[in-house]
Amino acid sequence: MGSDWDEIKRLAADFQKAQLTSTLQKLSERNCVEIVTLLLEKQMLEVVFTNDGKEYITPDHLEREIQDELYVNGGRANLVEVSKTLNVDLSRIEVLAERIAAENPSVHLVLGQLIDEDYISHIAQEINEKLVLRGEISISELASQFDLPSDFLQHDVVEKHLGKIIKGRQDAANPRVFFTQAYIQRCKAKIRGALAAITRPINVAVILQQIGVQEKIFHSLLDEIAPAGQVTSKLANSQYVPHIYAKTQADWVNSFYKQNSFLEYDAIQKLGISDAKSYIRKQFPNEEFLFLKRVALGARLVELTVVTALNECSATKQYLDLTTILPSNLSEEDIEEVFSTIMAQKHSNPSNFVYLDSIVFSQPYLAQLVQPCQALAESQAKAAIDGGVYQQYIVEKTLAQKGNASTQELEDDGKVDKRDERRKKASSGKAGGGAQGRETKTKSTKKHQRGKAAAHNDSDDEDDVQQGSRGGGGVNKKAVKPLELVKTADIVKLITASLEEEGLEHLSKPIAALYTNQFNQTALARAQELFEATPQTNRRQTHAAIQDRINTLLIDIRLYEKGLKLFPQDTQTQLVKYLLKSLGNDICNELSLYVAGECNLTVKNTNLNVDQRNKLAQECEAQYRAALLEQNKALNKSIDEFELATETVLKACSMIIKKVDKKKDRLLIADHKKKLQKQLLECQDPALLLHLAALILFTAISGSILHASGKFVSAILQHIRGSLNEEQNALLLRYHDLVLQVLQATPDSSESKMANEHLQAMQAQVVELAQNFSRASVSKAD
């Protein structure tokens, strides 16, 4: 029974063993691949394939292998190298590396590298050894050495282990620099020793070069050392000035100022102080200074000496020599600057003084000095009235004002149509052949007429040529020279004797110049009073002046008429119209204004047109009215009719027409030609030059003068053509064509520039022809 039970137990054990025992069956490679693929498809398994695809590994195992690589490489592993070693794609390595760094605080991912704390501790020990050896180290040097980011080195390596592994301190001024205490002490000792040996100002750069200390360390340790001196600045060219030297400077400046109450900038700069003004302000913070260009004056010197003396000068009505109260080494420029500054600061009233050559005159003193000049002004005014000088000045001034006003009005009225008119002239001139039908647009010359006041510019064209007055003058508007009744020399004679007594005769001319205008105006005002007090005398003199003026204009018209009669009838008609519109209009204005004065009529505008003159004539007395109206109508008729109408007006005004003196005609024509030649020599404008040359040649050939505007140049050239040889005609024709080309082209065009160059080249020939032409030379050449 017992044996059976034992058998049963044995069988039960064998059965249990059979149940627990599994059969091992080896699968083929293909079956394994299919099983893994099936697991991957059902996402029951995650693996990472190698780069060649022959192997795969789970992420957890790959992570352990990455950590193993980090350990094998001493705590610093480059992910690129790990990827090559493990034969796994870099992106998989980077993902796992980020997970490792995130899960493990002791591991850092820096620029594609895994770094653990063991490696950080290792490089901290290296940094400490280097710091002990050199005494100073910077983050930039460490970044270059370890090939790590500077921020990582500073925050996670150096600052983290500073005071533990790394024995040193951080620079407060530059946190990226670290020192050892021993290095700081050595630098302090060097700086302290060098500064203690210095007795004069020296550049900081020289000190640093000698002791071998960096500039930034020098400036950071300087305050801790508390040297016996100071550094001027922290810039490159700063200097160290020892206190002993600064004390010597200050003692000298204080002593000089105490004795003289002023300081010279040059003297301070010689002490080695570059900015003298700033040094003075710093050295004397409680003192007030008057800073000039070369010196600084103390307030005590200015207030107690100069201002007090000026006030006394004003009170006593005398003068003050500033050189006697100011330091002797001040120049005249310095003294003048002192006076100007005091006046600007209103220490005294500027209107009470006059400064001349270091001398300050009070106004009462000068007023008393020039008092005799009042009598001089009175006598000069009376002499000007008695001699008729002032009356002549009034006439010239009135005529000039009328002429200028006329020119301005005509210029304003003609602005609208000038451009179109110029285009028409240019196109019409271009259409003609040779000199036939050519019209040259030129600038105006002056009307050549005798008399002291030049007539106003005519209104025929903005560019018409007006022949210059035989009395002189240029192309511009006439300006009457101011009348000088009292001259500087007259005042000098009166005040020199008084100034010689004071030794100030060298200032007589400057003082006289100050009062010349004042006394001249006084004399003119007095002359005006005397002039207005004798209306009959003034009227007679004005009557005589206008009578001479009208006779001069009539003689001019007669001479111009002879010249224009040499032209064909159609051109002659245009020249007559132009002559009456210019000179005839002047005669009408002169007589209308004179009659208005005789009738006590007020005329606001002295430059009258035909309608204004007719209206003025209607307001005049009956004895003048008809004659003036007829004269205005005659402006549109012939020259003879105009002269007859003018004679009627002159008779009504009790004026005499001078007899014709034909003996003087040749002299007048010769004088007229000389004035044209003078204008020609001074002329640079090609169009005006051609116009003047044509007028001169016409006078030389015909023996007559001509009053013509620029549009008649073509007609003049055609008229004189027969008296010139072929070469001369060709020269004038070519010059005329070039002038038209310049006027028609735009100013900056190549065509205009080329034409101007040709004109410049031909200018001398044209001038030579006009200046030296004579009929005899032409006949000889022919």
UniProtKB/Swiss-Prot annotation:
<dbReference type="GO" id="GO:0061666">
    <property type="term" value="F:UFM1 ligase activity"/>
</dbReference>
<dbReference type="GO" id="GO:0034976">
    <property type="term" value="P:response to endoplasmic reticulum stress"/>
</dbReference>
<dbReference type="Pfam" id="PF09743">
    <property type="entry name" value="E3_UFM1_ligase"/>
</dbReference>
<keyword id="KW-0808">Transferase</keyword>
<comment type="function">
    <text>E3 UFM1-protein ligase that mediates ufmylation of target proteins.</text>
</comment>
<comment type="similarity">
    <text>Belongs to the UFL1 family.</text>
</comment>
<keyword id="KW-0833">Ubl conjugation pathway</keyword>
<dbReference type="GO" id="GO:0032434">
    <property type="term" value="P:regulation of proteasomal ubiquitin-dependent protein catabolic process"/>
</dbReference>
<dbReference type="InterPro" id="IPR056580">
    <property type="entry name" value="Ufl1_dom"/>
</dbReference>
<dbReference type="InterPro" id="IPR018611">
    <property type="entry name" value="Ufl1"/>
</dbReference>
<dbReference type="GO" id="GO:1990592">
    <property type="term" value="P:protein K69-linked ufmylation"/>
</dbReference>
<feature type="compositionally biased region" description="Basic residues">
    <location>
        <begin position="443"/>
        <end position="453"/>
    </location>
</feature>
<dbReference type="Pfam" id="PF25041">
    <property type="entry name" value="UFL1_C"/>
</dbReference>
<dbReference type="Pfam" id="PF23659">
    <property type="entry name" value="UFL1"/>
</dbReference>
<protein>
    <recommendedName>
        <fullName>E3 UFM1-protein ligase 1 homolog</fullName>
        <ecNumber>2.3.2.-</ecNumber>
    </recommendedName>
</protein>
<feature type="region of interest" description="Disordered">
    <location>
        <begin position="404"/>
        <end position="477"/>
    </location>
</feature>
<dbReference type="InterPro" id="IPR056761">
    <property type="entry name" value="Ufl1-like_C"/>
</dbReference>
<dbReference type="InterPro" id="IPR056579">
    <property type="entry name" value="Ufl1_N"/>
</dbReference>
<dbReference type="GO" id="GO:0005789">
    <property type="term" value="C:endoplasmic reticulum membrane"/>
</dbReference>
